[in-house]
Structure formats: C-alpha cells, structure tokens
A protein has these predicted regions:
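Low-complexity, acidic Ser/Thr/Pro/Gly-rich terminal tails and inter-domain linkers that flank the onset
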Residues: 30-71, 152
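Terminal connector regions
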Residues: 34-40, 101, 121-153
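Asparagine-centered strand-capping/turn motif at beta-strand->loop junctions
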Residues: 74-78
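Short acidic/proline- and small/hydrophobic-mixed sequence motifs that coincide with surface turns
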Residues: 81-84, 98-99
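Hydrophobic beta-strand segments
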Residues: 86-89, 104
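Short aromatic-acidic-glycine turn motif
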Residues: 91-101
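Short proline/glycine- and polar residue-rich coil/turn motifs
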Residues: 107-116
C-alpha cells in the first residue's frame, strides 16, 4: 500500500482531524484507515470483476503446431475509465486439468466508461486443450487510488 493513498484516504474520511493527535494516535488512526481502505478496495475490485466482462470471445487451435489464436470483447459497464486491464486465458484438458496459462493487455489505453474494447491473443503451445476460461485482472494502483480519492464508496 502506498503511504500517499492511505494518507489521502485517512484525511478524507476524518481519521486525522484535530490538531491534538500524538504520534501514537496518528499511527493508530492510520492503521484503522488502512484497514478500511483495504476493505473498500476489495469491494471495488469485486465490483469491477462483476461489471467489466469478456463477451463474444472464442479461440481456435492450429492442428499442426498446437498453437491457439483467439479474440474477444471487453465490456466496461461502469462509470470508470479503467487503465491497464489484463486478461488471463487458462487452457485445460477434457478432464479439467490445466495445461497452461497465457495473458496480456486488453489495450494500452483506458477502457472508456460504458465502452467496449476488442482484443486478440495468440498462445504458442496449448497441447491437447479441449476448453479454456478467461478472466480479467485490474491494476491495483488504480483500485487503491480510486478508493483513496473517494470515487468509490
């Protein structure tokens, strides 16, 4: 956690109000603020996972090299411009055993509020994968800063 994010959050939420705080009281208040910041950040991360989704995605194998290419669309159903969104594709055998994972960035730009962004991917070896799943990952710094600034409560 960035000290700056915790301090912004603590100040904004009133943890550091008053000018009679001793060093020990400040440390205790910052610790309390840190716990609340983490709790709220986890809620925001869950909100993003539920409201920023991959749709219309597919993949196909090359029979000769066991490689895969695919594409998809990320829908941002939030009011936030979201930077640095990454995807992780997990390839599995018929019995559900994982073979490999691959990942990358959806885009180097932000995904606009209520916008969509298409992406494509290539994985050099997936063996005899019969199915795959995909998930998105969001930038921790973006999540903490958004919560610290009070843009998500």
């Amino acid at each position: 956690l960035s000290d700056d994010a915790i301090y912004k959050f603590a100040k904004r939420k009133g943890y550091l109000s008053g000018d009679t705080l001793t060093d020990q009281k400040v440390a205790k208040k910052v610790s309390e603020a840190s716990k609340e910041l983490i709790s709220t950040a986890l809620k925001f991360a869950t909100y993003l996972r539920e409201n920023v989704t991959v749709s219309d995605w597919n993949w196909e194998t090359n029979d000769y090299s066991y490689s895969v290419s695919g594409r998809g669309v990320v829908k941002n159903n939030t009011k936030y411009a979201i930077p640095d969104v990454k995807y992780v594709v997990t390839y599995m055998k018929r019995d559900g055993t994982e073979i490999t994972q691959d990942g990358g960035r959806v885009t180097y730009d932000e995904i606009r509020p209520y916008g969509m962004e298409s992406f494509s991917f290539y994985t050099s070896y997936v063996g005899n994968a019969s199915h795959a799943r995909i998930r998105l990952e969001f930038d921790d710094e973006f999540i903490l800063e958004t919560v610290a600034k009070g843009e998500y409560e």
